[in-house]
Amino acid sequence: MNLSRRDFMKANAAMAAATAAGLTIPVKNVVAAESEIKWDKGVCRFCGTGCAVLVGTKDGRVVASQGDPDAEVNRGLNCIKGYFLPKIMYGKDRLTQPLLRMTNGKFDKNGDFAPVSWDFAFKTMAEKFKEAFKKNGQNAVGMFSSGQSTIWEGYAKNKLWKAGFRSNNVDPNARHCMASAAVAFMRTFGMDEPMGCYDDIEQADAFVLWGSNMAEMHPILWSRITDRRISNPDVRVTVLSTYEHRSFELADHGLIFTPQTDLAIMNYIINYLIQNNAINWDFVNKHTKFKRGETNIGYGLRPEHPLEKDTNRKTAGKMHDSSFEELKQLVSEYTVEKVSQMSGLDKVQLETLAKLYADPTKKVVSYWTMGFNQHTRGVWVNQLIYNIHLLTGKISIPGCGPFSLTGQPSACGTAREVGSFPHRLPADLVVTNPKHREIAERIWKLPKGTVSEKVGLHTIAQDRAMNDGKMNVLWQMCNNNMQAGPNINQERLPGWRKEGNFVIVSDPYPTVSALSADLILPTAMWVEKEGAYGNAERRTQFWRQQVKAPGEAKSDLWQLMEFAKYFTTDEMWTEELLAQMPEYRGKTLYEVLFKNGQVDKFPLSELAEGQLNDESEYFGYYVHKGLFEEYAEFGRGHGHDLAPFDMYHKARGLRWPVVEGKETLWRYREGYDPYVKEGEGVAFYGYPDKKAIILAVPYEPPAESPDNEYDLWLSTGRVLEHWHTGTMTRRVPELHRAFPNNLVWMHPLDAQARGLRHGDKIKISSRRGEMISYLDTRGRNKPPRGLVFTTFFDAGQLANNLTLDATDPISKETDFKKCAVKVEKAA
């Protein structure tokens, strides 16, 4: 569909209004008069905010983009990265053909990259897959995917691995950012994802940020919070962090605490609520139940590590029946005096924060991102903030609630909702539940027993298995884990380069990961393919393909579906399975999984006239619609309802559950959520008893703390101008010039004590590796004494040479925020 910007906006204005009101109306296919630039709607490629954009194309290239003024999320605004979206696609080193390490025309793990055909690449891959399966079984092959993949790419990966290969070794890079949040949602409410939405911002009286620099990481949402704060003098903003950053500029209360003591701070708040009779007993008695967590649960390190000795690591996720009295006893030791000493916050700061949550007249929204999630007790801190909101009843109502912000455009839609984790299936189903496996097998038309009950390997376990030779093939898609993941030198790189292992990286650019792989597959980007993302407020948004990918680059979806043709059921399935469905004998996995009468049932005629759609044209049917409608069957009628496919192309996103054409803004609350019956008031229907869990857990120390040799805390993160590993943003000249290289931020007195000055070339070292960088004592980030901060966007400075691969033992998410380092002047 080619529209001028004016006609596009006119055609969608009524739809935007109708969608906001929960209505649906038909939209005609308006074809604009010839215009130099043709416009269509899209979704920003960066963070999890889900900003809508208008994409302008000319002569087969994206030449312009702007914020969509009719979009509810961003209201016409973009951040600095969003304004340069077109340029992410046109870096000079864009990959356009498959590249395989070769010597004399044959694969050689130590050879140089040489161009090959797609067929040669896939035949080589298939050979390596089959060798690995034969050597080490179904779990010898792994997929590390992405919260940047489109919804149907994530769904196809899940289906190929869990149904086709009968292996649950699929993990997304959301493991590094959202796993703790997802696990805590499931443990607390029996369902994943936030109950509120961005509309809370305009109705809240107070905002509390826990480990979240929204000013730089979610700037569009921060602009809405800023507007709310400036236009309402009684609104308050509190920011808690281990160092000062740009979000402190708006804060009424800026609190810098000692790393890991957020656990103690929240237990103090709970103690304050109890001691000051600030518990909403009516809410608590009707809608909650009490549990206590297993303690001394270890740090997700290798079993032989000293920190794993004599721990309850094997039962880390267990929750025991408990009571309010037991919670009261546990938190009683977290007095204001003790927590002040532990955290470094003064008593007034702590009491002011506790009073904010305790005040029944104040609507409070708590936001957090990686400061909570990338934490060796990330699940606990997530559940502790839920405790506070549940104990006060400040949840599931406009302007009140706990809200986990995502960092990737579809960490929710693709990683979590699709179930791209090694223990999950779509719509919060899990592989360990036989009834859930039966649902998947029914929808996917598979023999009973096809989906394995064995939980696959998470990414840190994949790294270790590759290093140990127990997993032999890894396919990495749409991420740069060799730069983004922890402990590069000791685990990941040795495993990737180990003789006998084979690594495939699908990427549009020659990243650190790609250059460490054996085979590089060139991928289509952003609007070079039809796509869908799910943002942090449960909003599912679609866009159409608007330009073609360069050269031989293909979408990840095409790669997955085409690769499925290189395997047959006879090779991958047991005789017991084939005997149940003999009609599947000899068929390719492509035929069984994708050309199955469901995915392929929508003809090409359902595409908009003149609409690009390379995958559908290649396979001969409307691939995306078929995949989506099959996927949506998992959640409809179960609180995860998605609208019909065609609705999303007409709207600017819809927040699930979408029931009878109406989206849901606040879940679990009568009058807002169609799954809450009249008279229930609140129903946390993820659990059969419709009650949420309040969990009693203590403070436990981090895996590594500063000592005499490594005397500083290291925290890693991002800056406004760059996104993750900089694969896209460093190829935008304007963004690169604005922030060309990584820095290490340090307190001026810490620098002085080491004989260092602002701008010095330094060496920062940990027990795992080192990095050469430059010192900043005057910039936007202002660490307290004893802590340094750095970023990971710079491929020339691999910050994750330093980080420890300690994880939360429950969520398996890495703690990138706390390890011990030393800093000295570089030679």
Swiss-Prot record:
Query: According to the lineage, what is the superkingdom?
Result: Bacteria
Q: Which cofactor does it need?
A: [4Fe-4S] cluster; Mo-bis(molybdopterin guanine dinucleotide)
EC numbers, comma separated:
1.9.6.1
What's a GO cellular component annotated to this UniProt protein? periplasmic space
Principal place of residence:
periplasm
* Tagged with keyword 4Fe-4S: yes
Q: Which UniProt keywords apply?
A: 4Fe-4S, Electron transport, Iron, Iron-sulfur, Metal-binding, Molybdenum, Nitrate assimilation, Oxidoreductase, Periplasm, Signal, Transport
Q: Which residues bind substrate?
A: 792
What molecular function does GO assign, one term? molybdopterin cofactor binding
What are the disulfide bonds? Answer: none
Q: What class of enzyme is it?
A: oxidoreductase
In this protein, which residues make up the domain named 4Fe-4S Mo/W bis-MGD-type?
37-93
Leader sequence segment: 1-33
As for subcellular location, the record says: Periplasm
Q: Which GO terms describe its biological process?
A: cellular respiration; Mo-molybdopterin cofactor biosynthetic process; nitrate assimilation
The record's catalysed reaction(s) read:
2 Fe(II)-[cytochrome] + nitrate + 2 H(+) = 2 Fe(III)-[cytochrome] + nitrite + H2O
Q: Name one Pfam family in it.
A: Molybdopterin
- Assembly mode: Component of the periplasmic nitrate reductase NapAB complex composed of NapA and NapB.
Functional note: Catalytic subunit of the periplasmic nitrate reductase complex NapAB. Receives electrons from NapB and catalyzes the reduction of nitrate to nitrite.
Instruction: Indicate what this protein is called per its UniProt record.
Output: Periplasmic nitrate reductase
- Which gene codes for it? napA
